[in-house]
UniProtKB/Swiss-Prot annotation:
The keyword Cell membrane applies. GO terms for biological process: proton motive force-driven plasma membrane ATP synthesis. It comes from Aliivibrio salmonicida (strain LFI1238) (Vibrio salmonicida (strain LFI1238)). This is ATP synthase gamma chain. Signal peptide: none annotated. It comes from the Bacteria. Belongs to the ATPase gamma chain family.
Length: 288
C-alpha cells in the first residue's frame, strides 16, 4: 500500500484537476446559452428559406435552374462541420462515423467524393483519413459569421456549376435538446422537394417573379445554400458547448469519486501506520 504522504499528494493533484474541469464546465454552460440564443435567432430564417425553396422545387417554373435538376450521381460533395476544439465527448467522432458510412455507400457504387471541411477537428481527421479535401476552414470562434463561410461554400458551388459535382450535402450535429445532439446529413443540391404534405396537397398556386425568375433564382438559391451551411455551423457550435459541459461535469463527478476512494485508502494507510507504531511501542515496553 502506498504511503500516506504519497496518497495525500495524489488527492491534492486530483483536487486541482477537479477545479479545472469545474471551471471548464461553467464556461461551457455560459457559452452554451449564448450559442443557443444565436441558433434560435437564425433558425426561423433558415427554416423559412427551406420552405420557400422547397416550394420552388415543387413549382412549374418557366426557368429551370440547374440546382433544381436531378442528374446521375457520378461525383458527390460533402460540407462537413465539426468543432475547432476537443474535450466534447464523442460529438465529433460520432459525426465522422456517420459521414464515413455515407461515403462508403457512394464509394461502393463507384462514385467519387470531394470534401469541404469546417473546423480543425474535421480538417485533421479527413486529411489523416485520406479524403479528397478541396476546401477547409477553421478558427471561426464562438461568433461565426456568414462572410467567413462564403469562400468554402463557393468552392463547392463552383464545382457543382461546372458539372464536377452531382450532389452536395451538409453534415453537422443538430441540436435537439441539452441531452441529445444528433449527427445529420442533409442534401443541399439538387434542391430537395418539400416534405410538407400540406404544401403538396394545396400546391395550386405559384410565386410571381419580378422582374425575371432567372436573376432572382440565381441569387436566392445561392443564399439558400449559404444559409443552410451557416445554420449548420451555429447548431454544431451549440452542440459543442453542450457536449463539453456534459463531459466536464462527468469529469468533475469522476474526480470527486476518485478523491473519496483515495481518502479511504489514505485513512487506512494512516490507521495502519498508527497501529504499527503502537505495536512497536508496546513491544519496546515489554522488552524493558
Amino acid at each position: 500500500m502506498a504511503g500516506a504522504k504519497e496518497i495525500r499528494s495524489k488527492i491534492g493533484s486530483v483536487k486541482s484537476t477537479q477545479k479545472i474541469t469545474k471551471a471548464m464546465e461553467m464556461v461551457a454552460a455560459s457559452k452554451m446559452r449564448r450559442s443557443q440564443e444565436s441558433m434560435a435567432a437564425s433558425r426561423p430564417y433558415a427554416d423559412t428559406m427551406r420552405k420557400v425553396i422547397g416550394h420552388l422545387a415543387l413549382g412549374n417554373l418557366e426557368y429551370r435552374h440547374p440546382y433544381l435538376e436531378e442528374r446521375e450521381a457520378k461525383r458527390v460533395g460533402y460540407i462537413i462541420i465539426s468543432s475547432d476544439r476537443g474535450l466534447c465527448g464523442g460529438l465529433n467522432i460520432n459525426l465522422f462515423k456517420k459521414v464515413m458510412a455515407g461515403m462508403k455507400t457512394w464509394s461502393e457504387d463507384g462514385v467519387e467524393i470531394d470534401l469541404a471541411v469546417i473546423g480543425s477537428k474535421a480538417t485533421a481527421f479527413f486529411n489523416s483519413y485520406g479524403g479528397n479535401v478541396i476546401a477547409q476552414n477553421s478558427g471561426l470562434g464562438d461568433k461565426p459569421s456568414l462572410e467567413e463561410l462564403i469562400g468554402t461554400v463557393g468552392v463547392m458551388l463552383k464545382k457543382y456549376d461546372e458539372g464536377q459535382l452531382d450532389r452536395l450535402y451538409v453534415v453537422n450535429n443538430k441540436f435537439i435538446n441539452t441531452m441529445v445532439q444528433e449527427p445529420t446529413i442533409d442534401q443541399l443540391l439538387p434542391l430537395p422537394k418539400s416534405e410538407d404534405e400540406a404544401m403538396k396537397r394545396t400546391h395550386a398556386w405559384d410565386y410571381i417573379y419580378e422582374p425575371e425568375p432567372k436573376p432572382l433564382l440565381d441569387a436566392l438559391l445561392i443564399r439558400y445554400v449559404e444559409s443552410q451551411v451557416y445554420q449548420g455551423v451555429v447548431e454544431n457550435l451549440a452542440c459543442e458547448h453542450v457536449a463539453r459541459m456534459i463531459a466536464m461535469k462527468a469529469a468533475t463527478d469522476n474526480a470527486g469519486d476518485i478523491i473519496d476512494e483515495l481518502q479511504l485508502v489514505y485513512n487506512k494507510a494512516r490507521q495502519s501506520a498508527i497501529t504499527q507504531e503502537l505495536s512497536e511501542i508496546v513491544s519496546g515496553a515489554s522488552a524493558v
